[in-house]
């Protein structure tokens, strides 16, 4: 729907209802908890109640006034106008964080988000949403001050701790020399050395591992034949950012030790053959015994902790993404709702024109064109209805549905992806299938995920090989409906076959690993099963069942 049609419909609604704010979507605009305004040429056309309350203005007081009222200075008003005057010619949405002045002269910090009503007709103006973040800013300032105080305290404590550590290291060195002199305590020392839950190694200036305990052998491993050196170890080492570290450049090697000690350096270790990966926290001290420099290093296995940290990071990222999707769903539903009435009005006008033309000679061609316009408006209304149903919150209700129609509706949502990736969709649907009791939105979500995965799996294949097959059949006992999605993509690695449905497991660089987990939960809640199988050398087939 164009911006002119929206403006025309607004004028008609106001004329019919005497500008009553309780009519149609005016109620939504006026009573939404978000501060919203409509601008044209940097002047207010209309503001909702929340916007006027936020900045201390009476109802209608800002109408037709310049937005200069909200800027702290003339300079800021002029500068922002010059910098962003042509912003929407290159971008769809504007978002900024800035101070805004209220009517009483007080200043509050806000997040300002705006976009054109109609990108094809900028003269209609733009819509803006303002969020008050003053309390958040004050909290940030308080937190920053607290952090600065804490940093000073930590620095002081660190200096004290460094003194204690140096003193402790001297005591340890003294005790070690005493133990070497006292040979009668050697046996006790060796037992303690090998019973420690952390790996310990002693390395000389040439990189030879002179001594290591059992835990070190289990964590790092050692060659079967001496001499044992770091160069002979089969492992590959890397930092937390993935940068490889040569064995001779390991932080605890003598050549790289700049100070007497290093503390809790995290480093990754991967075996060349098994590709098994571990994470270690390494601390070391530089000692001089009998005139020879040696390094004593302690290795702690932190693999489990690193996995937990990664899972927490993925969970946090997913919660953030779901929050954005939630907001987008609300906006999509509101847009579908607001565009519905203009479509119905346009459809009624066209149908009226068509009825009048039926009795006019020579108007058959015009009547046919109007019929096509009516058909396209019906299709637009149906698309809006599907979008609204798909994104709105709903209580899962299972009703008898034609599974073929559910599949077709899902493909309509993915038509853009299908054409963009040059994918050929091969439908193998049984005619007139029996009705299946299901929650349409949830099953569409499953199909959406499986079809999208199939399209992405074939993105690097030759265009003629990008064939996606979707089909269904009734089970041999007649009690369930089988639906499958089969692609001819790169396939799934052997190591990933058994973990395909594990939460947070993914083979995609930007994936989160929860899509198939959610799909399986939905299918199981319907009393069905979701399974995966390979199809030849390449390709994958996902199949799920639903009770009839």
Curated annotation (Swiss-Prot):
Give the gene symbol.
tdiS
- Species for this entry: Thauera aromatica
Q: Which SUPFAM superfamilies match?
A: ATPase domain of HSP90 chaperone/DNA topoisomerase II/histidine kinase, PYP-like sensor domain (PAS domain)
Domain Histidine kinase spans what residues? 334-548
Q: Which Gene3D superfamilies match?
A: 1.10.287.130, Histidine kinase-like ATPase, C-terminal domain, PAS domain
Q: How is it modified after translation?
A: Autophosphorylated.
**EC number(s) per UniProt?**
2.7.13.3
Concerning PANTHER family, the annotation shows: PAC DOMAIN-CONTAINING PROTEIN (PTHR43304:SF1), PHYTOCHROME-LIKE PROTEIN CPH1 (PTHR43304)
Can you name this protein? Sensor protein TdiS
One biological process term in Gene Ontology: phosphorelay signal transduction system
Tell me the function of this protein.
Member of the two-component regulatory system TdiR/TdiS, which probably regulates transcription of toluene catabolic genes (bss operon). May activate TdiR by phosphorylation.
Q: Which InterPro entries does this chain map to?
A: HATPase_C_sf, His_kinase_dom, PAC, PAS, PAS-assoc_C, PAS-like_dom_sf, Sensor_kinase/Photoreceptor, Sig_transdc_His_kin-like_C
